[in-house]
Amino acid sequence: MNKQQLASKIWESANKMRSKIEANEYKDYILGFMFYKFLSDKEVKWLKENDWTDEYLQDLTEDDAETLDTVRKNVGYFIAYDNLFSTWISKGSDFKADDVTVALQAFSRLIDPHHKKVFDGVFATLQTGLSKLGESSGARTKAIRDLIYLIKDIPMDGKQDYDVLGFIYEYLISNFAANAGKKAGEFYTPHEVSLLMSEIVAYHLKDREEIKIYDPTSGSGSLLINIGQCAARYMGNGNNIKYYAQELKENTYNLTRMNLVMRGILPDNIVTRNGDTLEEDWPYFEENDPVNTYDPLFVDAVVSNPPYSQAWNPNDKENNPRFSDYGLAPKGKADYAFLLHDLYHIRNDGIVTIVLPHGVLFRGGEEGTIRKNLIDHNNIDAIIGLPANIFFGTGIPTIIMVLRKNKKDSDVLIIDASKGFEKDGKNNKLRACDIKRIVDAYKERPDKIEKFARRVSRAEIVQNDYNLNIPRYVDSSEKAESWDIYASMFGGIPEAELQDLSAYWTAFPHLKAALFSSDNEAYCHLNVQNLKNAVLNHPDVVAFKTAFQNAFGDFDAYLKSALIDGMTQLNAAGEEERLSWEIFARLAGIPLVDRYAAYQLLDDDWKKIAIDLEIIQTEGFAATKQVDPNMVLKKDAEVQDGWVGHVLPFELVQSVKMHEEVAALRAKETRLAEIAGEYESYLDELSEEDKEQDFVNDSAFVAAEVKKAIKAREVEPATLSILKDVDVLFAEEKTLKKKVKDDSAALHQRTKSVIEHLTDEEVRDLLHRKWILPLMENLNSLPDAVLDDFVKQLDAVCKKYETTFEDVESQIADTEHELLGLLDDLQGNEFDMKGIAELKKLLGGE
């Protein structure tokens, strides 16, 4: 299984296993056991690298003081053989819940003193929560055994596995968050928002060799990790990043530490604290000697997603250096207190990205004063309005604010990104194209992007009384539908409404004149019969499609060279960005095609390509010719059900290498479907009396009873004829079903063999079909999508005034006249005729 499949399997099982335990609580147990496995496997790996064999491992006890000391100094902790995760697994039915209790107590006792801050108390939430996994010792043992068996297959023993482990950890956290309701906000920032903030920060820090990053409300730590990963792409050395984190809630603080350690971050680069960020600021100090170890923390970047509009205590904080130059946030809303905390802790050339409720942009009082001071101090770099319902557990409209200390320009970039998203269950989610559009706008800082972004001067903000509400500066609303009164009365197409399609007329300069004839300076009429054909066959439109085809004519070969020929060497993390630059460059001279729509197509395919590249680069090219057992759950047990391609899907290989066998099998399956239809037809021919006979049951023929009825010959001749035909169908169906089953099994086995014996060139061809052909097909569809949308809009304008009010009035008059004629023919009693006479008056008949 790839990491996506493994993560999905673990989540599905874990969600079933948690039963009545809240998702918010259960996550602490499964993630805690994952972390213990990671630490256990890491120690075993270090020991084996230092000549310990499996046999020697059994002698690993804390009674061996020399070994204990060596392991603690090198690994940061010590786990005895009896307490190793692998030992728990090997115990099988002898494993007991108490084994975990003993192991966790021993771990806490045997942490290396130099690593206390990283590991001390990290399993506290798991230890206290074990009792909730079952009411009896036996129930707890079963629940824990199920949990450790669930995660035993997660790889944790090599550099490449940090990504797999981290992916699964993030996947589980995000899914638990989706099921945790309002509590999700305590520990999780959606990955897409985290990625957006990370890209902005990493761009700002791209030229630095060493950086420090800090999250004062760290939650699960995912936001910090994403920043680190993005920054490492520019820096090249992830070990030159130091991570600082503070979190108020103990269980969430433990998630932060686990997540950072499991991503392969060096313990010396992790500095975390469990505390109240607003009450206990971070001049860093050792608890046992606060005066002599006082060290104010200033970092390159602060990122945070603090609790929204949280109550806090501003008393006696007027002279606190974090707030003294700006003011104190109101006690009922700590949003600006968190922001000022973040701003204080960056270096003069640092950057802050913080998620806040949009009310901070326009609320008055103390918040208005702070906002004014931030503008006057030139600290606000950008404001990004996010879509509604983007965070788990809250529908509050939110923004990302970007802040800096020594900003050279005095304007503020305001981006309204509230319209760009996709639905994901109950929530909205940023797409890859939405993130890139925002990040590109931040990097390029244009004067204006219509309905999306604008650079606003400080003078304009001051003129608006320091109100930063986004709609004041960027109008992203759609144009309201309007109706032209003249065209509604007399017909014709308003030139003003055609002008709304000006981008198309610019791209196709001669098209408008070919489609429309002018009635006067303000109105025109359509002079072609088939609008779509007239548009698509016009020379300007043909030239547009040809230009696109020329721009991407050799892109297939380009992709083949980049991805297929270079699959073992390319940097997968940076390749998508390089390909996006190439696509954007090719689209530079092509009007109308949205480059971000093209980027989304690339990203959709890249997710699949990246998984394959990761496998090939970590396991070798031979992995492409590998098949794996297809494991499925049957009656709570995992059993094998055939095989699946490790990289190459069976369906792809069959369509290319075994199309004749596949076609023959599909023909048999088609015939089976036809037989089912023929049964229905024969049933329809039966009388209702026949349908009550034993040879029909639940609207289906019964094979054995059909034979009996034929043999007895007690039915009508027509019915007997039907039954004989049905009996023949039963025989054919039985033969076909066996044949389909046998042929399917044979095809499956042959596909396995074909994959295992592919030549390298055949593999490259199949990868080309899997990776490149779908992307090319999607990209080549972009011009057609543009033209379809254009024709749809144009057709709507043309049809809008096709029927005038005069036409409607005429139709009404004709209908009334017709109705009057019908009323004249009606007969009835005295009262009926009086009613009809009155109706005729209303219709103008008298």
What are these regions (language model features)?
Residues 400-441:
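Conserved P-loop NTPase
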Residues 37-50, 54, 176, 205, ...:
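A generic secondary-structure signal for well-formed alpha-helical elements
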Residues 9-10, 16, 22-38, 330-403, ...:
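Conserved Class I SAM-dependent methyltransferase catalytic core
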Residues 36, 220, 250-251, 278-279, ...:
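Conserved nucleotide-binding/hydrolysis micro-motifs of P-loop NTPases
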Residues 433, 437, 441-451, 456:
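Eukaryote-biased recognition of long, low-complexity, charge-rich segments
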Residues 1-201, 271, 277, 385-388, ...:
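Non-catalytic, mostly N-terminal accessory regions of nucleic-acid modification and defense proteins
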